[in-house]
């Protein structure tokens, strides 16, 4: 048996001991996520990021984050036609504690998309790439299904290949004209109202009746060079603060941001 001191016991117990537990949230800050002014709901939530330390800037880690929000939440609407549309917003800049977002795409929920695919009908899909007036290159996916004639006794409503080609060409023409003739803000409004799909359904009635025509997905392939002034223009006053009309003593209407406080006067 070796004779000597036990170094572990002489130092007061096990090696390492109990480490001090540090709360990871103590090093993080909350930021408000702001949607562009084309939507009714401006603040869509909050996001968490590590506080700025040395060369690690918090805003650099916030830029590029993508947030997926239902259109019903963005428009404060309980219409079921809006609830299955998801809009993707990407963080492009940070002002104070506000993360300013821009449109980054649109998609349908999986349950809605799968519920539309049924037997005894023809699925027609068109994929179009077009550029907006302000330089955004988009890939638009459109989908539609042939409708059954109410007066017919047939179980199926299949379209001929020549009719499918005509409908797909009509879809491509309408989407190209709508996208290339509008800027991003106007296009997002059209997607929110689903006006493009309604125009396609109405235009294709003479070729073959359609139903469940939707813009299924929109992808942003290319963006113009980032311009802060254009992003601030999309967000109105920049920080997403709502302005209220204040009537001065002379009776003129003055727009002032929410939470405005007059400066303290040194002398009266």
Swiss-Prot record:
Location relative to the cell: Cytoplasm
GO MF annotation list: structural constituent of ribosome
Disordered: annotated segments: 1-21
Main localization, broad class: cytoplasm
Organism superkingdom: Eukaryota
GO BP terms: oogenesis; translation
Pfam (any one): Ribosomal_S3Ae
InterPro entries from the UniProt entry: Ribosomal_eS1 (IPR001593), Ribosomal_eS1_CS (IPR018281), Ribosomal_eS1_euk (IPR027500)
Any single GO CC term annotated in Swiss-Prot or TrEMBL for this entry: cytosolic small ribosomal subunit
Keywords (A to Z) from UniProt: Cytoplasm, Developmental protein, Differentiation, Oogenesis, Ribonucleoprotein, Ribosomal protein
Family: Belongs to the eukaryotic ribosomal protein eS1 family.
HAMAP family assigned: Ribosomal_eS1_euk (MF_03122)
Stated role: Essential for oogenesis; required for late follicle cell development.
Subunit description: Component of the small ribosomal subunit. Mature ribosomes consist of a small (40S) and a large (60S) subunit. The 40S subunit contains about 33 different proteins and 1 molecule of RNA (18S). The 60S subunit contains about 49 different proteins and 3 molecules of RNA (28S, 5.8S and 5S).
The protein's name: Small ribosomal subunit protein eS1
Organism in which the protein naturally occurs: Drosophila persimilis (Fruit fly)
Source lineage: Eukaryota, Metazoa, Ecdysozoa, Arthropoda, Hexapoda
